[in-house]
């Protein structure tokens, strides 16, 4: 059966700002409390989506969450009208307001883990929204993430939704950013690789500088929930030194597509053992495209997000890399990519660069912005039954006009305390749900 790998990208929200919230995210820390440009950020993300759609790839769109999250501030003791709550939080707890205003839901690689129907015992697509307990500003996303995914993938004949795991560090789950899949072709059964940084129950090496986010126990639970076919799941440990260098998720240093694993050798605790285990689990040859310190240092790989590129199969079965423009500007990263595409021994034939500087300054590259979902033709038809989330020229034009209408060009840290920003954001999201055919999605839209 024909199948497509659809990339569902998160739209950048109107409150995109540099709050410096993410522990272990070096770019986020370096950009903390500087001015952002939400309009530019959203347009950059949309242009990336448009480029992939123009290449003939299946490209979807997921909406941002409502921010500032006034309902969360109420749970934390702030009272009064919405405007009063925002002003008070800005005065007495500005860090809390920044967290509740974060547009981090744009990085939908952390939204969920998705297993395609070819990999599961019941032949259905399984989705588990990530609980993200390691960072407060992300831990509040799971309920709306679940609602969005259930709206988009609503047909119970094809899709199974699991609740987020219990929200604690024992089951810390960061979604698809720590999950990869290898397969002969997208529609065929594959091997799912779950990458963890720590274990709550086993004594394993740990990073020293930054905390590991994904637990082995969470990865094992998601694999069980998804009913992955026996022997077709692997659990691999991140390199502790990589986490300390700023690779807070596996997708900062590795990306897989079909029969290719493109990665930095520091990504895993033992890269040789990892390759051996993958080779044993797969019934088809795997192209391991690996680099190390001699070609691209770990620090440069993290700075440029070289391996947070998207690795894509084009119509015609050639592969291409969509890398952040920071890689083009880096001598070592650019040279490595040029050598990869010139090597006829691997399927990667092209590289393109994309400007995502607004997202990159917050520590999110091309792969952070997308959730990969392999869909058969009937599954894709089911997605399009009740919503308008697959990008075409008309939807692109509508979204571009929507962004230009509603988004500010500059947002400073103090602007987060402006109650007008909440009203602007709600007006934007209210219109967006109409554009996407969602109906009422957000709390403010309900009586």
Curated annotation (Swiss-Prot):
The keyword Hydrolase applies. GO terms for molecular function: N-succinylarginine dihydrolase activity. Pathway: Amino-acid degradation; L-arginine degradation via AST pathway; L-glutamate and succinate from L-arginine: step 2/5. Keywords: Arginine metabolism, Hydrolase. GO terms for biological process: arginine catabolic process to glutamate; arginine catabolic process to succinate. Substrate binds at residues 19-28, 110, 137-138, 213, 251, 362. InterPro entries: AstB_sf, SuccinylArg_d-Hdrlase_AstB. It holds the Pfam family AstB. It catalyses: N(2)-succinyl-L-arginine + 2 H2O + 2 H(+) = N(2)-succinyl-L-ornithine + 2 NH4(+) + CO2. Its EC number is 3.5.3.23. The active site is at 174, 249, 368 (nucleophile). Homodimer. Belongs to the succinylarginine dihydrolase family. Catalyzes the hydrolysis of N(2)-succinylarginine into N(2)-succinylornithine, ammonia and CO(2). This is N-succinylarginine dihydrolase. It comes from Nitrosospira multiformis (strain ATCC 25196 / NCIMB 11849 / C 71). The gene is astB.
């Amino acid at each position: 059966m024909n199948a497509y790998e659809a990339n569902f990208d998160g739209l950048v929200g109107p409150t995109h700002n540099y709050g410096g919230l993410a522990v272990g995210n070096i770019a986020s820390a370096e950009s903390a409390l500087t001015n952002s440009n939400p309009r530019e950020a959203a347009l950059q993300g949309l242009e990336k989506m448009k480029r992939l759609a123009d290449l003939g790839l299946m490209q979807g769109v997921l909406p941002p969450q409502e921010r500032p999250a006034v309902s969360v501030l109420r749970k934390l003791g702030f009272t009064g009208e919405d405007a009063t709550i925002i002003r008070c939080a800005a005065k007495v707890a500005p860090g809390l307001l920044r967290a509740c205003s974060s547009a981090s839901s744009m990085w939908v690689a952390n939204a969920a883990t998705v297993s395609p129907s070819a990999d599961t015992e019941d032949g259905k697509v399984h989705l588990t929204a990530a609980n993200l307990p390691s960072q407060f500003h992300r831990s509040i996303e799971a309920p709306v993430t679940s609602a969005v995914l259930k709206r988009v993938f609503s047909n119970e004949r094809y899709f199974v939704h699991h609740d987020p795991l219990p929200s604690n560090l024992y089951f810390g789950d960061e979604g698809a950013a720590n999950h990869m899949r290898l397969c002969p072709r997208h529609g065929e059964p594959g091997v799912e690789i779950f990458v963890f940084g720590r274990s709550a129950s086993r004594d394993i090496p740990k990073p020293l500088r930054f905390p590991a986010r994904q637990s082995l126990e969470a990865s094992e639970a998601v694999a069980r929930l998804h009913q992955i076919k026996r022997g077709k799941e692997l659990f691999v440990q991140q390199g502790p030194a990589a986490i300390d260098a700023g690779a807070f998720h596996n997708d900062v240093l590795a990306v897989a597509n079909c029969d290719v694993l493109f990665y930095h050798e520091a990504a895993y605790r033992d890269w040789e053992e990892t390759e051996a285990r993958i080779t044993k689990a797969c019934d088809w040859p795997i192209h391991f495209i690996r680099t190390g310190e001699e070609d691209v240092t770990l620090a440069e790989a993290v700075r440029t997000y070289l391996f947070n590129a998207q690795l894509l199969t084009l119509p015609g079965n050639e592969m291409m890399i969509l890398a952040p423009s920071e890689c083009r500007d880096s001598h070592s990263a650019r040279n490595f990519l040029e050598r990869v595409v010139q090597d006829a021994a691997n399927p990667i034939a092209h590289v393109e660069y994309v400007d995502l500087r607004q997202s990159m300054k917050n520590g999110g590259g091309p792969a952070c912005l997308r959730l990969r979902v392999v869909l058969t033709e009937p599954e894709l038809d089911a997605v399009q039954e009740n919503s308008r989330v697959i990008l075409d020229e008309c939807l692109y034009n509508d979204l571009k006009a929507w962004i230009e209408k509603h988004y500010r060009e500059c947002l400073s840290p103090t602007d987060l305390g402006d109650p007008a920003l909440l009203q602007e954001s709600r007006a934007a999201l209210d219109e967006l749900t109409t554009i996407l055919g969602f109906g009422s999605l957000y709390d403010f839209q309900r009586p």
